[in-house]
């Protein structure tokens, strides 16, 4: 049977690996040697699952969205990651990695963040576990996500605004890697998505795989079968998508649909649709698809959503697209906003702008009445209310 899982060297097909400066070799090697042993140990599993249950509030509900289902002519279940503590899927990964860091004897935690959700999740877990926390965040994102910045500070984290480049997620990641190079002995870098050098893409996917583990059980209870016909998720770096599909990745009965950020349109030069626009390259230690110009320089990505404007893509998803295991759709800003308003009006759920891209993909699909669709709402929309308010003037007529 064809498998889409990672191999021992950290590759998904031709994508992945660890392309890193020499100064980080020891850190990454130490992590490669530790992560599998720790993640598979009984002590870790017990502590991780107890925190997911008692602190995060898992399992997150699998909610049959009746009015949305009626609109699209199929059965749509929403996997409600927006109901987790801190309001998104990011907390699953943050808890796992900080537990790993403690077991590795690290004292200082650093993280990058775009929308601020991963930053808040990491700061939250560091407060819980009494660890020093430094979060790198592009100045553009600091301005558009200031509520999350204040939350991180309140939680005791130091937020360092990054003023290089486009001042967004890519630049924050660059700064976090620089910090790690300078403090290799005592610092653990908590990457928030399925990006970066091996073992990060695999480790983050494993920690997020609790999502698909729960979907299997919940579908069995509600539909009498463990698998849906379609799994849908938004993809920036790819961690909520990886968690959503993890236990279904080799099950060809399930059609995987990934929604990436089309921005102002994939032909406009203002986009973050990496799978459609990217060419093979290396970004943040991984060989994957990267949005770049003729000279191989990484282009600045654009999306209305701070969590999706990354010019790379997790190697798992690059491989799924290459092997045609996943259908990838570019959803532009307007389509995402329309979908966010639609979910709010039909189901009383305000989604994050990132999740709204997955919802925007519903309109591009043709479902049968018997189809079972599971769509992951990766986060709640509180952080995006100002953007929605700006847009709402033109949309008040939406029924």
UniProtKB/Swiss-Prot annotation:
Q: Which residues carry this modification: N6-(pyridoxal phosphate)lysine?
A: 90
Q: Which Pfam families match?
A: PALP
- Key words, A-Z: Amino-acid biosynthesis, Aromatic amino acid biosynthesis, Lyase, Pyridoxal phosphate, Tryptophan biosynthesis
Pathway where this protein functions: Amino-acid biosynthesis; L-tryptophan biosynthesis; L-tryptophan from chorismate: step 5/5
Catalytic activity reads: (1S,2R)-1-C-(indol-3-yl)glycerol 3-phosphate + L-serine = D-glyceraldehyde 3-phosphate + L-tryptophan + H2O
Q: What class of enzyme is it?
A: lyase
Q: What does this protein do?
A: The beta subunit is responsible for the synthesis of L-tryptophan from indole and L-serine.
From the Swiss-Prot or TrEMBL record, give the protein name: Tryptophan synthase beta chain
